[in-house]
Amino acid sequence: MSVLTVNLGENSYDILIDGGTLPSLGRHCLERGLSGRVAVISNPAVAELYAEQVRASLVESGNQVTLILIPEGEEHKNAATLNLVYDQLIQAGLDRNSYIVALGGGVVGDLAGFAAATFLRGIPFVQVPTTLLAQVDSSVGGKTAIDHPRGKNLIGAFYQPRLVLIDVETLTTLPQREFRAGLAEVIKYGVAMDLAFYELLERDSGRILEMDADCLERIVLRCCELKARVVEQDEKESGLRAILNYGHTLGHAIETLAGYGTLVHGEAVAIGMVLAARISLAGGYCSEGDVSRIVALLGRFGLPCIPPRIDQGRLAETLLTDKKSRSGIIRFICNRGIGDCVVVNLTAEQLLTLSGLEV
């Protein structure tokens, strides 16, 4: 088992990474002072596969377990679903000595984390991510949120988990589309932060697509190491942490306007990375060769590189609701070659023009 500690003072926590770790969840929670009433929040598809293992482990450690199921899909990561979760937390009798376990992908983790951050002004929660995207990105760092009709993740809080337990064996049950979408976040780390890691992804793309267990565990660990390093220096995204949004500014806007469910999150991020690379090229931060390498690797992993048809006026308007927008200026992440990045201040119109998406 790989153990990685995210050092955030009193908010520090461990990330445990291994295959077949789900049955040990209850013990690891107990070791961290978590016991009593616990709500496991999941969706029907994930619960069918893993809820019984998780429930049995938690019961064995002396917990009273309530399973709360939420609908699958980004379109349900909203206030209506959150209120249904609150209703069930109250009905189950959870109090400030209780905790929440988020069992699932990014939607479950984001919503369950925000429920934990706000229920009774905050109760502990544990992340048990079962998708590649959640394992390498959304489960680590304490970003919790729900969506608003005007944009993605506009209502949320920074709220760190007590523990992240990653069982890489859960990746074997992922639909191929979800697995490939998670690879967009993996590629993001290489482009924005680590050239050697990017080269490993190019070199081992075949093994990755074959879902080689050792290869996947190394990839998940490296992504978590890179994210933890940034979060430790900038927990609440006041500066450095913005680099983790590479590909996300345009990606989020495209995902919102295409309609949740049209593109899964990782597919939108892949398109956002291609557009970010074009903007970086136009700004002189990278070469044509760098852009070609990024497009090639995304294509090798079966990810889209061309945005759907979207009204550019609405796209510009949506960009201005982005959390990184200040007085009409967007803090945009450009890649500097491959393996490094830089923050550039641009207007929405400049972003669309430089990316080739004319207003």
From Swiss-Prot:
Cofactor(s) required, per the database record: Co(2+); Zn(2+); NAD(+)
User: Which reaction is recorded as catalysed by this protein?
Assistant: 7-phospho-2-dehydro-3-deoxy-D-arabino-heptonate = 3-dehydroquinate + phosphate
E.C. number: 4.2.3.4
Aminoacyl-tRNA synthetase listed as a keyword: no
Concerning SUPFAM superfamilies, the annotation shows: Dehydroquinate synthase-like (SSF56796)
Keyword presence, Amino-acid biosynthesis: yes
Which terms are listed as keywords in the entry?
Amino-acid biosynthesis, Aromatic amino acid biosynthesis, Cobalt, Cytoplasm, Lyase, Metal-binding, NAD, Nucleotide-binding, Zinc
Subcellular localization is given as: Cytoplasm
Report the protein's function: Catalyzes the conversion of 3-deoxy-D-arabino-heptulosonate 7-phosphate (DAHP) to dehydroquinate (DHQ).
Protein name (record)? 3-dehydroquinate synthase
Source organism: Pelobacter propionicus (strain DSM 2379 / NBRC 103807 / OttBd1)
